[in-house]
Amino acid sequence: MHPSELREEAMVASMVESIEIARSPADVFSYVTDPSHLPEWQESVVSVRREGDAPITAGSRVAVTRRIGRRERAMTAELTELNPPTSWAVRGIDGPVRGNVRGTIEPLDDGTRSRVTIELDFEGHGIGKLLVPLVVRRQARKELPKNQQNLKDRLESGAQ
């Protein structure tokens, strides 16, 4: 990739995907904000470990190992926003690739269904400045719709 293409790719807007799920916003929020569930619905997540035993709140951190391309990369994510049952936000705080995620949940059909929208962007640091445009964004563009379908399938099959 030519350097001008890297700069152009780095300025691309965040990715946004929505999906409708036949579960209440409270059910969706409870599941999606529990870090232990990440490997169940996010394809690239290899493992998750919470830092501390306190209940999940804004400021809570988790160590997440993801498969990016052919390698596994560890990073720490911090929950920056937690507004049950309507929104949450997470940001990567270390590692070469730092994801920034914002999720919103809208009630549908008198709250019996939900529309989940996830907005995702990345910051590259060090080698991550190359990884983000060359590998990470492409992988995420393919994975985000699959992850949302996985989330829908898990929740509609009765996952708690």
Q: Where do the protein language model's features map onto the residues?
A:
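Hydrophobic ligand-binding cavity/cleft-lining segments
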Residues: 2-52, 57, 150, 157-159
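Short, surface-exposed coil-to-beta transition loops
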Residues: 14-16, 72-76, 98-102
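A short, structured loop/turn motif at beta-sheet edges
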Residues: 25-26, 53-56, 81-85, 104-115
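Hydrophobic pocket/interface hotspot
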Residues: 27-32, 38, 62, 79, ...
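Short beta-strand segments that buttress and anchor functional surface loops
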Residues: 61-67, 88-94
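Short, cysteine-centered beta-strand-loop-beta hairpins and adjacent loop/turn segments enriched
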Residues: 68-73, 124-127
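Beta-strand/loop substructures that line and gate deep hydrophobic ligand-binding cavities in soluble
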Residues: 89-146
